[in-house]
From Swiss-Prot:
One of its GO terms (molecular function) is ATP binding. The gene is nrdR. InterPro entries: ATP-cone_dom, NrdR-like_N, RNR_NrdR-like. This is Transcriptional repressor NrdR. It comes from Mycolicibacterium gilvum (strain PYR-GCK) (Mycobacterium gilvum (strain PYR-GCK)). Keywords: ATP-binding, DNA-binding, Metal-binding, Nucleotide-binding, Repressor, Transcription, Transcription regulation, Zinc, Zinc-finger.
Amino acid sequence: MHCPFCRHPDSRVVDSRETDEGQAIRRRRSCPECGRRFTTVETAVLAVVKRSGVTEPFSREKVIRGVRRACQGRQVDDDALNKLAQQVEDAVRATGSPEVPANEVGLAILGPLRDLDEVAYLRFASVYRSFSSAEDFEREIEALRAHREVSARS
């Protein structure tokens, strides 16, 4: 790696540590030419493939924005949204694929959101799954009730 100070083409790794809950590696480096130290952060790139075929980097902030809209007027704090976004990223990364279709990101949001706030879940699901009638909402509410009963038993 080039030194950012003198542009020397090589550097030595002095220390490496995991950061961001294991999603990145922070490396402390030293330049043999000028002797200065600098830090680099390495992350595995995770890309989302949209329906149009366009690829963009995965963004926790985008997940939070979408879920925050569904949570508008609900008692959901920023810490819960950040935790949900981390769960979504972990689920998407667990697929092992460097490129994930956008609909898989949406599916990864639904589970944690259902556990966080059922009303926000219904709002998000209605847009994500393109509900077009009251019957669509009724079916989803029945599925929520069934999930709640199964969760209560275990």
